[in-house]
Amino acid sequence: MSALSVLYLVLPLPLVFILHDTEEAIVQHRWVLSHREALTLRFPKLRPVIEHLSNIGTKAFVVAAMEELIVLIVATCYVLTGGTYSTQIWSALFLAFSLHLFVHLVQAILFRGYVPGVLTSLIFMPYAIYGLWSIWLTTTVVDFLLMALCGILFMIANLKFAHWLGMKI
């Protein structure tokens, strides 16, 4: 990975994550509680997810976000050391995070209004697109899809762990 890619793409990821999750942490719990009924009526199949999110308080959310931030910081530092497969590991996490930003935009469209995280998703979408394009240009299609799949699977597993951890503390 070039020095400019590290400077413009790798190093900002933890900060972008912090800013995005700060928006979510500030409004998530109150927003879900105040929109729970409307969400359940509009999306009845998502009732278990809505109930789960209703039970995650701000403290639990912040603990979960801190765990995720540690993962991103470790991956970012690993890139800086030039470790084996560090670029692929970081790229997988970046692809998953970029998908997460895109999901917020889709949620806002489906909800037809504000959802927690959508403002920073809009602000950071150019960064995500730049990163996706940079990764796309430096890998094969198969590697790109494999990193995306690994990143998404890791994100799902880690999110479950992070939420569990947040509820325990």
What function would you assign to each model-found segment?
Residues 25-54, 169:
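Cytosolic, membrane-interface loops and tails of multi-pass inner-membrane proteins
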Residues 1-11, 75-89, 129-146:
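Helix-coil boundary and interhelical linker segments in multi-pass alpha-helical membrane proteins
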Residues 128-169:
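Terminal transmembrane helical module of multi-pass membrane proteins
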Residues 26, 46-66, 107-111:
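Membrane interfacial helix-start motif at the N-side
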Residues 95-104, 115-135:
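Hydrophobic alpha-helical membrane segments
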Residues 2-29:
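N-terminal signal-anchor transmembrane alpha helix
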Residues 58-80, 123-129:
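Core segments of transmembrane alpha-helices
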Residues 18-25, 97-108, 152-168:
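Transmembrane alpha-helical segments that form the membrane-embedded catalytic/substrate-channel core
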